[in-house]
Design a protein with these regions (language model features):
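N-terminal, intrinsically disordered, polar/charged segments of Gram-positive cell-envelope systems
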Residues: 59-110
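Folded, non-transmembrane soluble domains that reside on the lumenal/extracytoplasmic side of membranes
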Residues: 3-6, 267-268
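Short, positively charged and aromatic/hydrophobic N-terminal segments
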Residues: 7-10, 14-16, 20
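Hydrophobic single-pass membrane-insertion segments
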Residues: 53-64, 235-238
């Protein structure tokens, strides 16, 4: 960073640059305080942009990171406080099981949209029009290089497979062939992954393979405040060609593991 300021100081020694800056400053000093404030703000912005450019800072990412969901123009249509407390069922139905897609979604050609990670490194919604053409043609590869927000490697004997957390695909690999995509992987319990999400993924995959039709499929991770681990995910799906006669659901899947208490702030856990 010092190199940048040294170069900036050297530029000030250049007579033309020096005269311009001093001239502008002198001119504005003669005006009222509002104009002086505007000049200071302009100089501050220029300096900030210069530093950002010099150090290759992703300004767009910083500006958009507080709400990555806007990238695919969707936020969950419910308040987390309205979701019933987990009662040994992996999911609850939302909005009378009706997804919240619009006509533009149905009209789009086959697509896959993944939100950029937000300023905490968290995933946003993942949205796709699933069809035979989006499904994998090879076995899934390794995904252990991805460390989703809140990731903890911890084992419990009461968990099938021992590991509490899985790297959960928002849109399952069998639907869109996305492997180690950090924008499509969250920290999820084994229970949510296998008991909660997988049955819905299998339902959609079987429908697409059997009918060769398409399905709109969107998964939205629900984070409370600045928690790094999602409280759950909203899964919406609707068959395209018959407007939901084949597949139609909207559910909230709990990111829980029976017998274990989870700190959603950072992913830490204890036996309850």
């Amino acid at each position: 960073m010092w190199v940048f300021f040294i170069n900036f100081a050297k530029n000030l020694e250049d007579s033309k640059f020096h005269d311009i800056i001093l001239g502008k400053w002198s001119e504005h000093m003669k005006k009222n305080k509002t104009n002086i404030s505007k000049l200071l703000l302009t100089l501050a912005i220029a300096l900030f942009l210069g530093i950002a450019t010099y150090f290759n800072i992703d300004l767009e990412g910083l500006l958009n990171s507080s709400n990555a969901y806007n990238k695919i123009n969707y936020t969950a249509s419910f308040d987390l406080t309205t979701i019933p407390k987990f009662e040994n069922e992996p999911y609850v139905v939302l909005n009378d099981n009706k997804p919240d897609f619009n006509e533009e979604d149905f009209a789009r050609d086959t697509f896959e949209d993944y939100s950029p990670l937000d300023y905490l490194g968290r995933c946003g919604p993942a949205f796709a029009k699933v069809g035979i053409e989006t499904m994998p043609t090879e076995e899934r590869g390794a995904i252990n290089s991805v460390k989703p927000s809140g990731w903890q490697t911890v084992k419990y004997d009461i968990v099938e497979g021992k590991y509490l957390y899985n790297r959960c695909h928002l849109i399952g690999y069998q639907l869109t062939a996305e492997n180690a995509n950090e924008k499509n992987l969250i920290t999820g319990t084994r229970y949510m992954n296998v008991q909660g999400m997988l049955p819905f993924e299998n339902m959609v995959a079987e429908y697409v393979r059997t009918t060769k039709n398409h399905v709109l499929y969107r998964v939205t991770p629900i984070f409370e405040n600045d928690n790094l681990v999602a409280s759950g995910v909203e899964i919406e799906a609707q068959s395209v060609e018959n407007k939901g006669e084949g597949i139609c659901f909207n559910v909230y899947v709990y990111n829980v593991q029976p017998g274990i208490d989870i700190n959603y702030k950072n992913g830490e856990s204890t036996l309850n």
